[in-house]
Every structure is written in C-alpha cells, then in structure tokens.
Amino acid sequence: MPNRKASRNAYYFFVQEKIPELRRRGLPVARVADAIPYCSADWALLREEEKEKYAEMAREWRAAQGKDSGPSEKQKPVFTPLRKPGMLVPKQNVSPPDMSTLSLKGDQALLGGIFYFLNIFSHGELPPHCEQRFLPCEIGCVKYSLQEGIMADFHSFINPGEIPRGFRFHCQAASDSSHKIPISNFERGHNQATVLQNLYRFIHPNPGNWPPIYCKSDDRTRVNWCLKHMAKASEIRQDLQLLTVEDLVVGIYQQKFLKEPSKTWIRSLLDVAMWDYSSNTRCKWHEENDILFCALAVCKKIAYCISNSLATLFGIQLTEAHVPLQDYEASNSVTPKMVVLDAGRYQKLRVGSSGFSHFNSANQEQRSNTPIGDYPSRAKISGQNSSVRGRGITRLLESISNSSSNIHKFSNCDTSLSSYMSQKDGYKSFSSLS
C-alpha cells in the first residue's frame, strides 16, 4: 500500500492546527481524518496569503522527508523548499479566471461588456459543525454595463425552510439586526427551486455560454453556498461562475491604465453610504418599512460605485441608470451660504484665540448691520496676514466712513473707545491708532 504520510499538504497542517479547537467544542476528533469534514468551510474562508503559511509548512515537511530533491518531481523552481520566508517568491493572486472571462479588447469591449452583480441574504450564519450553514431569505441581481448603466434587475424573497432546532433565537437576532425579514410565516417568500429557476432565466435568457456572476469578496462564501443549496431542490443544476467585484474592478483598471490598484482602495471605493437611502435602490418591501439592509440595494450600489468611479474615466455621460442623479448632484454641490458661515466661524475663532475678547461685541454688532453684499469681502479679508485687531478696526472705520449719515455716531464711538482703551496697560488710545 502507498505511504499515506507522503500526501501531507497545506490543508493537512491547517486541519492539524484546528484539532484542539474542535475538541473544545466537544466534537469527536481523534485524528486528522476525523477533523477534515469540520474544517472545509473555514479553509474556504482563508485568503491566499493565509494559506501560504500552511503551504510553507507542507514544503518544509516534504523537504525533511527528502521528497523535493528527486528529479521525478514536476514542481516549479519557485516552490522548492526555502528556509527563509523573505526569500519566498510571492504568487500572483490576481484571480486569473476573472481576467480570462472578461475577454476585454479595448475601450469598446469594456464599455459594452455585460456584468451581473448578485447577492443573497441569510438568516444569520450557523456554526461550522452544522450541515446547513446559511438560511437564504432574499436574493437580488442586476444586469449592468459601463455604457448603459443598470439595464435590468431581479429580486425575490426566499422561503428559508425549516429553522434548525436550537437556532431559532440565533436566526431571529441576526434578522433583527440587519434585513429584518421574518424567519417564518412570511407571505412574500417563494420556493427555493422556483427562485433559482427565475434567476437562471434572468442571467441566461438565450442559449450560449453562461456569463460570470460577481459579488463582493466578503459575501462570496455565503452566496456560493446558498446557490449550491438551492440547486439541490431544483431540477436544473448549473454551476455558476461566481467571481468577485474587487477582481473585476482591478481587471478594468489593468486593461485601461496598465497598472493594478490596491485591493484596499477598491474595497473603500465599494463601501460607501451616500446612496443608502436613494430612491429606487432598495426593494419595495424594504423601502416601505424603511430598512437599510436589502440584497437588491447591495447590487445596485455596486453599480453606482463603479459608475461614479469609472464612467468619467471613459468619458461616459452619467444617467439615471448609472447613479441616482438627484443624490449625486446634491452630494457634489456646495452652497455659497455654507462657505460664508464657515468664514464667519473662522474669524470668530481667531478673535477668541488672540486674546482680544473686548472687540467681540463690537464685531458682532457690525456683522448684524452689514448687508448681504458685504459677505464676499469679509471672506476675503479673513485670508489676509494682518492681525485680528487691525482687521476689526479697519472694517469698523471703512463701514463708518461709507455711511455719511453716521458721522455723529462715529465721533461718539471714537470718544467711548478712546476712554475705554486708555484704561488698559500697553494699549494706545483710539485716536493715536487712527
């Protein structure tokens, strides 16, 4: 019989590391083979750089067994055992399937390409040892292109089926904290097989190759599991190619600018809140109940973010199909009144911090008597390099000199200010300053 120890790979060492945790849960795991069924879901959630740790452990083990030095091994040179982690050649993690399925040649192919954004909500997430990890309750999908924007959308509530025993409170709490869809007796929920068949007809109405489907990387495990779970109850089984939106945006940037943006920047681009309450974004039920979390809204906001970021780079005129124009224009407009208020606040802060608090009452009285047309000059004066006390006196003198009817009032003000400032140590009289 072959030597079973020779088949140790990265997954073997990952399972070996998880055994103590599984035993603390009370699971009957005596060896690695017993723990493998409980670790597959956690392994799928790991990123490539996290899996590299266990791959290195497997390479070191094979090196110790003398398996890597033989000429019959058909491994690439970059995967030979290296003791120093700094010498490891990093693997390219740009998701090659994403780039090959795009088949983009030039800007016209980018603009005319059709993309489907999908999301499925669940009543929480059950522990890894449970056979049913998720309970799908809502699905949303949009058909999108850079040129046309959102071309069509699909939405449906899903009957999650029977809640596993002992997890009803857990599922109810997860629902109440997010989408608030009832976990049972929800009249809008449809059969899982029917929903999946309707989704297939939406994304693949004509014969031919099935298009790739995109979702956020954080939702990929849940969406992929729900699709396979729903396919079990359907007579039509189709393995959809589920890719990540982050890799799609990276591919578009690489095609257009020949350089790759960071995944952190891509995630910050997609995680925005400016369209959370935009009209025609959430489904009708979530809109009527004023609930923020909606599967259809997640898909539409992905399209909004991509349009907002990439459409201008391709010279596309934004329409209602790209972004909610009313909210988009409101978020990019600045009213002059806001600028004036900020300028006034800035001047008041500068006056208070400079120690000349005795000019505050005079300045406030002057501002209340200043017409609206003087606001731009005030905002301009605040950027000069003169002292705050000098600016205040200058504005006072200019406004008084422009009013010929207030000459008598000016003489009274001169006398009062002179008598007041003569009492302060280190200050000259008002007449000497003028």
UniProtKB/Swiss-Prot annotation:
Pfam families: HMG_box_2, Maelstrom. GO terms for molecular function: sequence-specific DNA binding. InterPro entries: HMG_box_dom, HMG_box_dom_sf, Maelstrom, Protein_maelstrom. It is found in: Cytoplasm; Nucleus. Residues 357-371 have a biased composition (Polar residues). GO terms for biological process: cell differentiation; male meiotic nuclear division; negative regulation of DNA-templated transcription; piRNA processing; regulation of miRNA-mediated gene silencing; regulatory ncRNA-mediated gene silencing; spermatogenesis. Residues 4-73 bind DNA. Residues 62-94, 357-385 are annotated as: Disordered. Coiled coil: none annotated. The keyword Repressor does not apply. Keywords: Cytoplasm, Developmental protein, Differentiation, DNA-binding, Meiosis, Nucleus, RNA-mediated gene silencing, Spermatogenesis. GO terms for cellular component: cytoplasm; nucleus; P granule; piP-body. Its main location: cytoplasm. Plays a central role during spermatogenesis by repressing transposable elements and preventing their mobilization, which is essential for the germline integrity. Acts via the piRNA metabolic process, which mediates the repression of transposable elements during meiosis by forming complexes composed of piRNAs and Piwi proteins and governs the methylation and subsequent repression of transposons. Its association with piP-bodies suggests a participation in the secondary piRNAs metabolic process. Required for the localization of germ-cell factors to the meiotic nuage. Interacts with SMARCB1, SIN3B and DDX4. Interacts with piRNA-associated proteins TDRD1, PIWIL1 and PIWIL2. Interacts with TEX19. Belongs to the maelstrom family. This is Protein maelstrom homolog. It comes from Macaca fascicularis (Crab-eating macaque). The lineage of its organism: Eukaryota, Metazoa, Chordata, Craniata, Vertebrata. The gene is MAEL.
